């Protein structure tokens, strides 16, 4: 998989066509989801302009977007799954302890003691806050989730490429995977 250039931030993705006029349903990953459409043209992973948002309206699970480029329903549907990037320079300055999800992907995850805990595969939000999907944990198959809160993620260093976590006992462990965990009292 090709990684975006450092000056690009993955901000949205096309979920499919909407209607017959070439509008697309778009999932935004911006902190304020509507902001994804105010940063100018969307770029592909190589920095080439692919779509320019003209109008966006909120709908369940995303936005319906009309683009300046002429699209019909078939062209809009063919774009399903397309990742949309914007220039980092177009985005607002981040506060301390704020991160773009795309900057976190692929970082090494370690415990408080520095022991390797895997790699960050994805950041999800199913409505109750961000969850980190961690994969490659030693002695564990598959991936597991951890809430992205200061309690469980006390330190992130983009510069060092490391996320330090303090998961609850048995989260991310072999015991959790096997359905074990704390015995019932």
Swiss-Prot record:
Species, as recorded: Maricaulis maris (strain MCS10)
Region (Disordered): 165-185
Domain writeup: The PRC barrel domain binds ribosomal protein uS19.
Presence of the UniProt keyword rRNA processing in the record: yes
Keywords of this entry: Chaperone, Cytoplasm, Ribosome biogenesis, rRNA processing
Keyword Cytoplasm: yes
Compartments, as annotated in UniProt: Cytoplasm
NCBIfam families: 16S_RimM
A single GO BP: ribosomal small subunit biogenesis
Assembly behavior: Binds ribosomal protein uS19.
Name by which UniProt lists this protein: Ribosome maturation factor RimM
PRC barrel domain span: 96-171
Pfam hit, one: PRC_RimM
Main location: cytoplasm
GO cellular component: cytoplasm; ribosome
SUPFAM superfamilies linked: PRC-barrel domain (SSF50346), Translation proteins (SSF50447)
Family: Belongs to the RimM family.
GO-annotated molecular function: ribosome binding
Function: An accessory protein needed during the final step in the assembly of 30S ribosomal subunit, possibly for assembly of the head region. Essential for efficient processing of 16S rRNA. May be needed both before and after RbfA during the maturation of 16S rRNA. It has affinity for free ribosomal 30S subunits but not for 70S ribosomes.
């Amino acid at each position: 998989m090709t990684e975006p250039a450092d000056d690009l931030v993955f901000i949205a993705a096309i979920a499919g066509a909407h209607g017959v006029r070439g509008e697309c349903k778009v999932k935004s990953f911006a902190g304020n989801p509507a902001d994804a459409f105010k940063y100018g043209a969307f770029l592909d992973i190589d920095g080439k302009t692919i779509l320019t948002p003209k109008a966006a309206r909120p709908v369940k699970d995303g936005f319906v977007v009309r683009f300046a480029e002429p699209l019909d329903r078939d062209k809009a549907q063919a774009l399903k799954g397309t990742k949309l990037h914007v220039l980092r320079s177009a985005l607002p300055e981040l506060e301390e302890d704020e991160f773009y999800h795309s900057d976190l992907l692929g970082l090494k995850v370690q415990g408080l003691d520095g022991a390797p805990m895997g790699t960050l595969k994805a950041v999800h939000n199913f409505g109750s806050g961000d969850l980190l999907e961690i994969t490659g944990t030693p002695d564990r198959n598959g991936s597991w989730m951890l809430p992205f809160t200061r309690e469980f993620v006390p330190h992130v260093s983009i510069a060092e490429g490391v996320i330090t976590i303090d998961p609850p006992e048995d989260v991310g462990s072999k015991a959790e995977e096997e359905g074990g965990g704390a015995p019932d009292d």
